[in-house]
């Protein structure tokens, strides 16, 4: 069982529940590619998703934790102005690396393991459609994660 974070333990205590009974389940953002070009395209698509979430004030505590509150406020301003196409450019490679597993197919299992071990008891892996369709990649990834 993975240790529960302090904030999760505090929430459980406030609700009168036993934090030890919880299992943290994670579903990380993924940017994957067979080569650098495909990886870059996947990263760009993920910037769109993350910029939407990061524009929402409910998520600004996450940005503040990393010192990116100004980015959150600018994303929020752009969203209110309907300037959705400008928002992904504000999500840096550093932000992607912080919030997602960014990897070439050959490195994915190792990077996922590094990111999830000690954090989540269970990890849900929602592979992009192209990666999911590549049965060799899926089989190899499962084998590497089980090793």
Summary of predicted features, one role per range:
Residues 1-147:
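Active-site-adjacent structural elements that line small-molecule/cofactor binding pockets in enzymes
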